[in-house]
């Protein structure tokens, strides 16, 4: 007959009766070192303090355990993880499309958008699309891309600049300069 299924704990740290060692290196509520004590004695001290006995590093010899309020510990841990996640900035690639015949007013609006994207810390992808007979005037497209590059010179560095046309478009990628 097979043994019963063992329910695997989802906790990262073993607490109280889950700890398997006979002796543990104990740390008190305020972080003071108590020393190497038996598991039974450590559990008694934790109960006296009205807290949990938490195994901090199970691979140490003997395992290191701390007397603490486990619920509060988990709350603090999740709080710090949320803070770290909030501070992380995900860099996105924003795309702005131009045409060889893009007029001055439209050019300025699109340039303003590019500046905003770069100031927000995002990368910008400039796509220059050729339609119909515009393919015959590829040098106009290169002039537009060079003008964009010059206008954004103090804000961005060019990550990739097209040497030749790919299909019916030229693509330039800009990254914000580090401050």
Curated annotation (Swiss-Prot):
Listed Gene3D superfamilies: Translation initiation factor 3 (IF-3), C-terminal domain, Translation initiation factor 3 (IF-3), N-terminal domain
Superkingdom to which the source organism belongs: Bacteria
Alphabetical keyword list: Cytoplasm, Initiation factor, Protein biosynthesis
PROSITE patterns (UniProt xref): IF3
Coiled coil: none
Its biological purpose: IF-3 binds to the 30S ribosomal subunit and shifts the equilibrium between 70S ribosomes and their 50S and 30S subunits in favor of the free subunits, thus enhancing the availability of 30S subunits on which protein synthesis initiation begins.
Cross-referenced HAMAP family: IF_3
Protein name, as recorded: Translation initiation factor IF-3
